[in-house]
Design a protein with these regions (language model features):
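N-terminal beta-strand motif that seeds the catalytic metal site of vicinal oxygen chelate
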Residues: 15-50, 63, 94-101, 198-207, ...
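Core segments of cupin and vicinal oxygen chelate
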Residues: 44-84, 89, 234-235
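Short, structured motif recognition centered on aromatic/hydrophobic residues
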Residues: 10-12, 39, 56, 62, ...
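Short, small-residue-biased leader/transition segments that mark boundaries at the very start
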Residues: 1-3
């Protein structure tokens, strides 16, 4: 089923067909962190973030993680233990901004960063950096379709039952993530925000992942999934 959020078409899917064959990467990697946290996250361009929050929060039941207004309007949503699986960016445009895949090993991210620079002169969209809200260390790559792919590691796991939505004002990154595709004046806004954050001594915690919390979220998800399947069988 497809619906629209005042511009972007959203497809709702239940129990998609999955391939039993294991994924084989084009280069040696340690694998991706998916499982109960899903693929990673997706971010959409929108003209007005505030107008669309009720659609995702109240109709689709996404939970707000955090939001910010400077240097650009952003709102992040979670649907499981991953800090955010979806986000809106108030760029005034429509369409796909980027999706993120999370690697199990930081070296996979670093090696991919090197390979992309060696093989594609202008392949990097955002330089290597670390985000302030989900603590993801990542870089963004250009695609032929015009959107970006974020290649990340070390994303934050939260407890959805205890999480409180809040505004963030540190800017999107602790360091790095220089937006090479933007004009100099636009890049300067983000650079100033990073410098302010550094001067305040803001940084991510030393421990960014908790195996115990991850396993408990996984267990809760599996119980909920079984219950949903039983409820569906009762309806049918």
């Amino acid at each position: 089923m497809c619906i629209r959020d005042r511009g972007n078409r959203i497809e709702l899917v239940y129990k998609p067909h999955t391939d039993n064959s294991p994924f084989v990467s084009g280069r040696p990697i340690s694998g991706f962190k998916t499982d109960v946290c899903g693929l990673g996250h997706a971010v959409l361009h929108v003209s007005n973030v505030d107008m669309l929050i009720p659609f995702y929060r109240d109709i689709l039941d996404f939970k707000i993680s955090d939001y910010s207004f400077d240097p650009i309007s952003l709102c992040f949503f979670h649907v499981n233990g991953r800090h955010h699986s979806f986000a809106l960016i108030g760029s005034g445009q429509q369409g796909f901004h980027h999706f993120m895949v999370e690697y199990k090993n930081l070296d996979d991210v670093g090696q991919g960063y090197d390979l992309l620079q060696y093989n594609h002169k202008n392949g990097i969209a955002y330089t290597l950096g670390r985000h302030t809200n989900d603590y993801m260390t990542s870089f963004y790559a250009h695609t032929p379709s015009g959107f970006f792919i974020e290649n990340g590691w070390g994303g934050r796991i939260i407890d959805p039952t205890k999480w409180v939505p809040h505004e963030t004002n540190e800017g999107p990154s602790f360091w790095g993530h220089e937006r090479l595709y933007l004009p100099d004046d636009e890049r300067l806004k983000f650079r100033k925000k990073r410098i302010e954050t550094a001067q305040k001594g803001k940084r991510s915690p030393m421990i960014i992942d908790c195996p115990w919390l991850y396993q408990n979220i996984k267990k809760k998800y599996e119980i909920e999934k079984i219950q949903e399947e039983e409820d569906l069988e009762d309806i049918l």
